[in-house]
């Protein structure tokens, strides 16, 4: 658009592939496979609408009285390369019915009526996303596996995120869920996430029963993992390896009950295990190894 500044607040949202459910109820069997999506200059401030590489949304139907609830079932995104996009790398999927997912304990019935089911995100490579790498939202038992998020959150800084106009959201992380139930993240890798108020590889955020297992992280400027606030419950982080993550390895962030078990943390001298100003939560450690990195 002529005269549009890269960082302006009302910049047009742009998406490599936008998937939108609205007036036809449940959308079944959508598969995106082996796609290359790159150089999408979206709006770095907009976290909730189609904006970035691949983004799926369920929007309010034209008539809620006559249309079924729009949502997704049996969606798979696999084998895609998403490079230099803003804001998101891959996200599935924001819903207009977000008010149905309030509180910490999330009822399975809410997902079967308003949320997404049988979501699989696997074997994707997201590099240099301006904001977050890969996120599952409002999904029941999503599977996120064998993905790579490399050098994401590169625009969540004062230089580019400079004209928010009162919008919140100057935070981003690597691979994480939002308001999911029993999400499973395994065999993923996150490297070189740029520092911001978050900036960690993994973030169990406002969900119920998130499991991270057999994942790897290295040199993420905001640390390895965050358990985000009081509405993220029943989180388990097990059998993962963190190598030279920075800033502070874990961020319990007022979380009530995180479990860290059978992980290996390779830690540089001077890097705290708990990130400063991201503490205050309760967590249990079982059989973890903390190994110093030789200079």
Question: Where are the model-predicted features located?
Answer:
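Carbohydrate-interacting regions of secretory-pathway proteins
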Residues: 16-17, 52-55, 91-92, 98, ...
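Extracellular beta-strand solenoids
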Residues: 19, 37, 56, 92, ...
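Glycine-centered small-residue motifs that form tight turns
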Residues: 48-54, 170-172, 199
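Residue-level marker of regulatory loop/turn positions in helix-turn-helix DNA-binding domains and
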Residues: 9, 24, 46, 69, ...
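Right-handed parallel beta-helix
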Residues: 28-41, 65-88, 100-132, 140-165, ...
């Amino acid at each position: 658009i002529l005269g549009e500044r890269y960082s302006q607040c009302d910049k047009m949202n742009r998406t490599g592939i936008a998937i939108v459910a609205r007036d036809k109820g449940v959308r079944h069997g959508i598969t995106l496979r082996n796609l290359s999506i790159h150089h999408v200059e979206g709006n770095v401030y907009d976290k909730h609408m189609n904006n970035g590489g691949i983004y799926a949304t369920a929007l309010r139907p034209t008539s809620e009285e006559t249309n079924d609830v729009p949502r997704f079932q049996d969606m798979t995104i696999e084998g895609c390369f998403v490079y230099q996009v803003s804001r998101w790398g891959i996200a599935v999927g924001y819903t207009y019915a977000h008010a149905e997912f309030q509180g910490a304990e999330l009822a399975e019935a809410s997902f079967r009526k308003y949320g997404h089911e049988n979501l699989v995100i696997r074997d994707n490579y997201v590099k240099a996303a301006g904001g977050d790498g890969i996120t599952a939202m409002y999904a029941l038992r999503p599977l996120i596996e064998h993905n790579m998020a490399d050098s994401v959150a590169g625009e969540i800084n004062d230089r580019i995120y400079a004209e928010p106009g009162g919008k919140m959201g100057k935070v981003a992380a690597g691979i994480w869920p939002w308001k999911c139930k029993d999400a499973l993240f395994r065999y993923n890798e996150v490297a070189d996430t740029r520092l911001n108020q978050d900036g960690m590889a993994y973030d169990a955020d406002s969900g119920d029963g998130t499991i991270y297992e057999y994942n790897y992280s290295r040199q993420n400027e905001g640390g390895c993992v965050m358990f985000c606030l009081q509405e993220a419950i029943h989180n388990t982080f097990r059998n993962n390896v963190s190598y030279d993550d920075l800033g502070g390895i874990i961020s319990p962030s007022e979380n009530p009950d995180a479990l860290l078990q059978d992980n290996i943390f390779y830690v540089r001298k001077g890097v705290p295990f708990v990130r400063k100003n991201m503490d205050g939560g309760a967590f249990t450690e079982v059989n973890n190894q903390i190994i110093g990195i030789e200079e």
